[in-house]
A protein has these predicted regions:
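Well-ordered, non-membrane alpha-helical segments in soluble/globular domains
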Residues: 105-109, 224-234, 264-278
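Active-site segments of SGNH/GDSL-like serine hydrolases
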Residues: 238-263
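Membrane-embedded segments
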Residues: 69-157
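Short extracytoplasmic
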Residues: 46-73
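C-terminal regions of proteins
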Residues: 265, 272-344
Length: 345
């Protein structure tokens, strides 16, 4: 056999031998689509692990470029991910992101607005009890990093070669096959969340929070700090969306953690300022902070920060109805003092 002929056959054989496994991995990654780069659905990708919503939800938006025509936007931290968009009468684009920092809100909101076919009629915006805390810093890279990565040429294709994508695809295949939702966030292809994750030891976690507060007090009697730019940040957000109605709401906090926080001497005045700033900017705030049968029942929470989705259904109901309920107080300038009194502060 001539050397050139032998070399050509060896090359072709190598390509075939190596190409079949690579092709199989690419096909599998595409079929399961753990990065949400595509729009197809099947029985083996109907549950998706929410490992990083900044990547996944941004990809979900770009996979539907030119097709987005949502009425409203939901923005907030991981707590909002358990408020499913199907609970709303209008079509809601859910851009809830784990550990979303107040300095990141506007970037993600403007990105969603740019991709949507029309201005949002309503923006449901969560501001948590820690959103004003100066010492809480952003936990992720800047938003533009995720936008650039999602829009990078050939990103959808090159990601199919990734072993990391394959590992995530394999996990999603398994939980979809078994209808397994014992993870923190199992998404379907419409960004609906399901979870049966086991509850942590809440009693132990509350005691740990008490110890942490005590340690901070001993280390620095004036450790709590309010972000002096907080109100201006809110004003900038409001002014960036002049055509949208804002429904601003607090996190629904488990009663024990709420009490520890707002009754702490260093937090009480900061909490009042936080509520006051929101009302000054938006006219009202939908507060889910309170002591009631929902917030005092630990069975409604799987940790001291997050409720189960059936409680999120209640939050969605109240955000739309716009009247006080057992779990909601709509705070305005007129009833603010009475609201603080109801919380014992």
């Amino acid at each position: 056999m001539k050397p050139r002929s032998w070399l050509l056959k060896l090359t072709i054989t190598s390509i075939v031998v190596l190409g079949i496994p690579f092709g199989g991995v690419m096909a599998f990654n595409y079929y399961i689509d753990p990065l949400w780069n595509f729009t197809h659905s099947n029985e083996y990708n109907d549950f998706q692990n929410g490992f990083n919503e900044r990547i996944q939800k941004t990809n979900w938006i770009n996979a539907r470029e030119g097709e987005l025509n949502f009425d409203s936007l939901m923005i907030g931290t991981s707590r909002t991910t358990y408020i499913n968009p199907s609970n709303f009468k209008e079509d809601v684009l859910h851009y809830g992101l784990s550990e979303l920092h107040v300095t990141e809100y506007r970037d993600y909101m403007e990105y969603a607005q740019k991709k949507n076919a029309k201005p949002f009629d309503k923006i449901y915006m969560e501001l948590t009890i820690r959103s004003f805390d100066l010492w809480v810093k952003p936990a992720f890279n800047e938003a533009q990093t995720f936008f650039d990565d999602s829009e990078a040429p050939f990103q959808r294709i090159t990601s199919l070669f990734s072993y990391d994508t394959y590992e995530r695809a394999k996990f999603n295949y398994e939980i979809s096959r078994d209808n397994y939702t014992d993870i923190y966030r199992a998404y379907d292809r419409n960004m609906e969340v399901f979870t049966d994750v086991k509850q942590e030891d809440i009693a132990a976690r509350i005691e740990k929070l008490k110890d942490q507060l005590k340690a901070r007090d001993e280390y620095n009697p004036k450790w709590a700090a309010y972000d002096e730019d907080y109100k201006q940040r809110l004003l900038n957000i409001r002014n960036a969306f002049p055509e949208s109605e804002f429904i601003v709401f607090t996190d629904l906090a488990i009663a024990d953690r709420l009490k520890l926080t707002i009754e702490h001497p260093q937090h009480t005045e900061n909490y009042k300022r936080y509520i006051r700033n929101i009302v000054e900017v938006f006219g009202k705030v939908y507060s889910f902070h309170g002591y009631n049968e929902v917030t005092t029942n630990w069975d409604n929470f799987f940790d001291v920060y997050h409720f189960y989705p059936h409680i999120g259904d209640m939050v969605a109901r109240d955000l739309q109805n716009g009247v006080d309920t057992e779990i909601l107080t709509i705070v305005t300038e007129e009833n603010m003092d009475a609201y603080f009194e109801s919380l014992g502060i």
